[in-house]
Regions:
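Extended amphipathic ligand-handling, pore-lining, and cofactor/metal-binding catalytic surfaces
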Residues: 1-153
């Protein structure tokens, strides 16, 4: 990360009551690991995880002493669709992002987040990540099933 730049990742998350397999905790763990391993300028928030929305992320950024600076936004989703284009980027207007979008909220909070700082590539656009998925699928296909398909539900 270039000095002074802040990198954010937008995950989907699960709304309260729908936290499958404690998946929401993985976003917090990812942020902690990114900060510990690479840079304290990495932050992860979600569209749907209570207590980990963009405003919560901004509060964490400020608490970490990062009250201003250039912010780069990346979707942390397989495909960069509606959430990346609208909830993160806030549309296509350079100077008038949609209210409530990450770009709008970050600029309102005193950060610099122009349209060009919103990367609209999903995880599936990176061959390295797709190769990890393929490896995991291959290993899963070669292992014992985790459940009995014939068992009554």
């Amino acid at each position: 990360v270039d000095a002074g730049k802040i990198v954010t990742f937008m995950g989907h998350g699960n709304p309260e009551g729908w936290n499958y397999g404690n998946g929401n905790s993985r976003y917090t763990m990812l942020e902690e690991e990114l900060q510990k391993t690479y840079s304290s300028n990495y932050f992860v928030a979600t569209v749907d995880m209570e207590d980990n929305y963009v405003d919560n992320m901004i509060s964490r950024m400020q608490a970490a002493g990062k009250a201003s600076g250039d912010v780069i936004c990346h979707p942390l989703m397989s495909i960069a669709g509606d959430h990346a284009n609208n909830d993160m980027k806030g549309g296509v207007s350079e100077n008038d992002p949609e209210e409530g979008s990450w770009r709008y909220e970050l600029n309102k909070a005193g950060y610099t987040c122009p349209l060009s700082n919103c990367d609209i590539k999903g995880l599936a656009d990176y061959s390295e990540i797709v190769n990890v998925w393929i490896s995991h699928i291959s290993a899963a296909l070669q292992s014992e099933p985790m459940y009995d398909q014939d068992a009554e539900e």
